[in-house]
């Protein structure tokens, strides 16, 4: 159910949700339109339970990152793990793989030719998720 008028939320939502909105959006620092959008995309229960974590993670690592992680996992409850799981943004899984192995084992000598995409496929894809350019650890 889409809440089209911000004034009617008191008539539509449960008292617990209204109280959360009053405390955090009206008297607090959260934007009411953003909060209502979150409820539309998820649920009232998820709003009350996870919105603080969503805002915190979004401010720390970016809302696009958080939204991609939630969408990939299919449940907003995963928002509690996104900051621990996030490894960065990369143009490809191969770029992440190259950086990962260089960080762990040191620079690969320039005379060696490494197929980083094949290395991703055979090794790292089991431990990491590549989602819309974002890399997340799958062990969180």
List each language-model region with its residue ranges.
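Acidic interaction surfaces
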Residues: 1-140
């Amino acid at each position: 159910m889409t809440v089209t008028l911000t004034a009617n939320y008191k008539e539509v939502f449960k008292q617990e949700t209204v109280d959360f909105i009053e405390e955090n959006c009206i008297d607090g620092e959260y934007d009411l339109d953003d909060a209502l959008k979150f409820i539309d995309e998820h649920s009232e229960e998820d709003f009350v339970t996870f919105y603080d974590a969503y805002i915190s993670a979004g401010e720390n690592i970016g809302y696009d990152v958080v939204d991609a992680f939630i969408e990939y996992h299919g449940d907003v409850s995963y928002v509690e793990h996104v900051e621990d799981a996030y490894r960065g943004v990369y143009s490809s899984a191969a770029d992440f793989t190259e950086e990962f192995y260089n960080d762990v084992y040191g620079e690969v000598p320039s005379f060696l030719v490494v197929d980083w995409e094949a290395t991703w496929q055979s090794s790292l894809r089991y431990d990491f998720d590549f989602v819309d350019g974002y890399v997340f650890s799958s062990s969180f």
